[in-house]
């Protein structure tokens, strides 16, 4: 789940990587000035999505997308398509 595209998507686009996907980070590294946090709620530091110049958690991103297509903090367009940078931990896929 999450590693494979549906049959329709494969037939439409082939095996090439889909464009316009924003990476979702499972674990952000700690920086010189502290940990990365969600700019909206300031609590979440895992599962962050990069908006134009800041990060948002999935909960805040969903809340902002329910109101508008634009970010309430920076005014940029909110990301709608996500892709995992690292594969979530799961048993290996065996057909």
UniProtKB/Swiss-Prot annotation:
GO terms for molecular function: RNA binding; zinc ion binding. Interacts with protein NP; this interaction probably directs the encapsidated genome to budding sites. Interacts (via RING domain) with polymerase L; this interaction inhibits viral transcription and replication, Z partially blocks the product exit tunnel for the releasing nascent RNA product. Interacts with the glycoprotein complex; this interaction plays a role in virion budding. Interacts with host eIF4E; this interaction results in eIF4E reduced affinity for its substrate, the 5'-m7 G cap structure. Plays a crucial role in virion assembly and budding. Expressed late in the virus life cycle, it acts as an inhibitor of viral transcription and RNA synthesis by interacting with the viral polymerase L. Presumably recruits the NP encapsidated genome to cellular membranes at budding sites via direct interaction with NP. Plays critical roles in the final steps of viral release by interacting with host TSG101, a member of the vacuolar protein-sorting pathway and using other cellular host proteins involved in vesicle formation pathway. Belongs to the arenaviridae Z protein family. It is found in: Virion; Host cytoplasm, Host perinuclear region; Host cell membrane. One of its GO terms (biological process) is viral budding from plasma membrane. This is RING finger protein Z. A lipid is attached at residue 2 (N-myristoyl glycine). Coiled coil: none annotated. Myristoylation is required for the role of RING finger protein Z in assembly and budding. Its main location: virion. InterPro entries: RING_finger_Z_arenaviridae (IPR024183), Z_RING-type_Znf_sf (IPR038485), Z_RING_Znf (IPR003224). A zinc finger (RING-type) spans 38-74. The gene is Z.
């Amino acid at each position: 789940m999450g590693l494979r595209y549906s049959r329709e998507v494969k037939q439409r686009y082939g095996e090439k990587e889909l464009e316009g996907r924003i990476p979702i980070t499972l674990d952000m590294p700690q920086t010189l000035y502290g940990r990365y946090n969600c700019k909206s709620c300031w609590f979440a530091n895992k599962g962050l999505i990069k908006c134009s110049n800041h990060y948002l958690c999935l909960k805040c991103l969903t809340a902002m997308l329910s109101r508008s297509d634009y970010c309430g903090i920076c005014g940029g367009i909110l990301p709608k398509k996500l892709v995992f940078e690292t594969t979530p931990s799961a048993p290996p896929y065996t057909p």
